[in-house]
Amino acid sequence: EKTRDKVLYGNVDQECTGIVTSCWASVDVIKYVIEKGANLIISHEALFWNHGDHQEWLEESKNSVYLEKRKLLDDHQIVVWRDHDYIHSGIPYKGDYIDGIFLGLAKKMGWEDKLIVNPINEFDPSLLCSTAYSFDHSIKAKDLAKELIDTCHLNGIKLIGNSNADIKKAAVLFHVFGDANEAIKNTDKSDVDCLLSMELIDFTYAEYLRDSGMLGRNRVALGMGHFNLEEPGMEYMLE
């Protein structure tokens, strides 16, 4: 498949009564849509918990959660459209193109004028980078964590590494599912003080950061989680 952007569920020929955007079309999001009288969910991620949103295996196993979630969609004639690649691939911004998801994060945090090139993760060179930030003044790791919690309305953040680090530069750390060799090498060579992490495996990158902190390195990861980092981008999509 060339794109992940497609209708995941429902009848698109019906009249649209309202639109809700979300990072993921969870059961609670579906219930919210029903309550508001809407019938179109624009979701950033897949609907049924797998890459490609395949449903055959769930049908064959008669998965009870799948069947109940599907019934909720059917009973209220809800359509789910996935918008993943488009908003990541570049939207017009100040005469250039920028990743819309992470522009949303920068806007929410007031970091639009602080964007720099991300030295940890390779990024599409055709896009204006929107995944790393340089601050005018240093900020303590704990204070930055609190700012993220308050602004993004989070229940908490996992802090890994030197909790007393002074943050001048921060960067989004993309998916670390297991092998973190490249991310560790790039981090060690960089002057980034804080990593805003999506998925983070304890036995590789997280342990590297813990050891860094124990050796007094000025570096920390703030584990926000995948959806918490990308949700501001789906909020920005409404604009």
PLM region spans:
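Active-site catalytic microenvironments in core metabolic enzymes, especially phosphate/sugar-handling
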Residues: 1-239
